[in-house]
Structures are given as structure tokens and as C-alpha cells.
């Protein structure tokens, strides 16, 4: 097995949103975040069993050839956390034992994410 370090790229602001406060960027513990995500309807089961189409499988194809990804976007909601983008990538990396990821979050939730899900790790290691 080969050790891959994933390089995270921030998502640029969408057209018309350039003047808004930029997203917060945090390092989170995958296990902690997954526990909060399990309580929501959008949770992707291990193996991608309830994922959308072939999105889960396409993540594997991507990481076979690449060592980078756009950051996921998540928000804290009443039920736990929800992804605005990246839930299939998160599930696939979770299932491969990645322990930490870099995530984009609303700036007003940045400290909550750090407090609830933060980690001292600063690398996303994928054994491929």
C-alpha cells in the first residue's frame, strides 16, 4: 500500500457571492464529524449503499489518479451536520480510514466546528 497525502483546494465563491464573508476553513476529526452526520437523512452508509447513483464509486476512480480534492462544505443543523458539497467523498474517505480532513464551513460556525469536531492532525492520509 502507498501512503497518499490529500491536498485540499478551497472552493471559490460562486458568482455573485464574491463580496460576502469568506467561508471558514477547519481541520476536523472524521470520526467525530461522522457521528454527528449519522443523525441526518443525507447520511451515506458505509460502502455507499444509499448514495446517489455512482457518485461513491466515482470517488475511488478520482483518488486512483489524483492526490487532491476540493474541500467539502458542511453546516451545523438541528439534527447534526449536513453537507452542501462532498458527502460521497467524505463517506468514501471515511470508509478508507482517513482520520482528518480540511473542510469549508460558514464563517459564523467556524468556532463551533473547531470545538465539536476539531483535531490536531494537519494531514489527510489515504492508504492506496
Place the predicted regions along the sequence by residue.
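A polyampholytic, Gly/Pro-enriched intrinsically disordered region
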Residues: 122-128
